[in-house]
Design a protein with these regions (language model features):
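Long helical/loop segments within the catalytic core of UDP-sugar-dependent glycosyltransferases
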Residues: 34, 111, 117-118, 124-128, ...
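A conserved acidic beta->alpha catalytic loop
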Residues: 92-101, 121
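Short, acidic, metal-binding catalytic loop of nucleotide-sugar glycosyltransferases
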Residues: 73-85
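Cell-envelope/extracellular polymer assembly enzymes that use nucleotide-activated donors
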Residues: 53-56, 87, 242
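Acidic helix N-cap motif at the loop->helix transition within catalytic regions
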Residues: 69-70, 97-106, 153
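Short aromatic/hydrophobic "clamp" motif used to bind/position activated sugar donors
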Residues: 141
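N-proximal low-complexity "stem/linker" segments adjacent to membrane-targeting elements
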Residues: 1-66, 70-73
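Basic/Trp-rich segment in TM-proximal cytosolic loops or flexible interdomain/linker regions
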Residues: 1-11, 34-48, 208, 268-317
């Protein structure tokens, strides 16, 4: 009797594990198409009238001498947003290369636009962001990596989600990643991945009503929402995943805006790509293990995120 039950349970589990990638893939495709056709066009916000809110752009920098100057000059001169309505805060996180010297020169060039916060020892992005929150003048924070350039209208487009009707519940909006360095086969493969698979996954998650993660490279946060969840979790390997879960657990909306584009450099070697993906995977697993309990305490309130949790758990298995 027990053998019969055991064998049938094993057969059922094997069937689930074998069929899930197929069934899950079909569900992702259908839900992403539904999101794009029926929801995105209706939700696409228009530009708003009136004085735009002040935005603080956070740029984390640890040994970024190759890209920091280009990024800061772009942010200071190319964004289509009133100059008096945004600032750039660079967190120089224990850099040992020429990053500090370059930033000093840029401060002379952009004295009213650029501020630099120096962290003596490298403590990570989340730690630097939590320090910068105490200096930020803006009610909204744009997280922007040192090798990332958002499209020129990005600030207007991001802010339109917060300013639209019902936008007071929006905690963060993440944009659409595009690859800027396309010189190696590894980078080209990742370009195709971001343009198709990642966008489809985020659209599918939005169809269910939530997001598994924000993009650490370019996301706009409501500062009040960041404070509401206790800031960025420095102990988490991937703070962008952790804060997405924290915000949604506390009732804030997390949105994906596919029409807001930003361009970033991706790893150009298989070794570097593997290191990046391993960090993403370990961060996702860590968040799953540490945050799922809080979501399950209120399953009805967090119903929209349950399919995302289940999918990620099965993906790990």
């Amino acid at each position: 009797m027990y053998d019969w039950i055991f064998n049938h349970v094993v057969d059922f589990l094997v069937l689930v594990l074998v069929s899930y990638p197929i069934v899950g893939g079909i569900a992702f495709i259908i839900s992403s198409i539904y999101q794009r056709v029926f929801n995105e066009r209706r939700q696409l916000p228009a530009y708003f009238d009136g004085e735009p809110p002040f935005v603080s752009i956070f740029v984390p920098a640890h040994n970024e001498e190759d890209s920091i100057e280009s990024t800061i000059v772009y942010l200071a001169t190319q964004l289509n947003y009133p100059d008096h309505c945004y600032e750039i805060l660079v967190i120089n996180d224990g850099s040992t290369d020429a990053t500090g010297e370059i930033l000093s020169q840029l401060q002379v060039r952009f004295p009213s636009k650029l501020r630099v916060l120096t962290v003596v020892d490298n403590r990570g992005k989340a730690h630097g962001y939590n320090i910068a929150l105490g200096y930020a003048r803006g009610a909204f924070i744009l997280s922007n990596d040192a090798d990332t350039k958002p499209e020129t209208d990005a600030l207007w487009k991001y802010m339109s989600y917060f300013k639209r009707e019902g936008g007071q519940n929006v905690g963060a909006v993440t944009g659409n990643m595009l690859v800027s360095n396309r010189t190696t086969l590894t980078a080209l493969v990742q370009m195709n991945e971001l343009n198709s698979i990642v966008g489809m996954i985020k659209r599918s998650q939005m169809a269910y009503g939530g997001l598994f993660a924000f993009s650490g490279a370019n996301t706009m946060y409501r500062k009040a929402a960041v404070f509401d969840v206790g800031g960025f979790q420095a102990e988490q390997p991937t703070e962008d995943i952790a804060i997405a879960w924290d915000m949604q657990t506390n009732g804030w909306q997390a949105l994906f805006a596919p029409h807001i584009r930003f361009f970033l450099d991706m790893p150009e070697t298989l070794r570097a790509m593997f290191k990046q993906r391993r960090r993403w995977a370990s961060g996702g697993i860590y968040v799953l293990l540490t945050k799922t309990g809080a979501l399950l305490k209120h399953p009805i309130k967090n119903l929209a995120t349950m399919p995302i949790i289940i999918d990620y758990a099965f993906s790990i298995v």
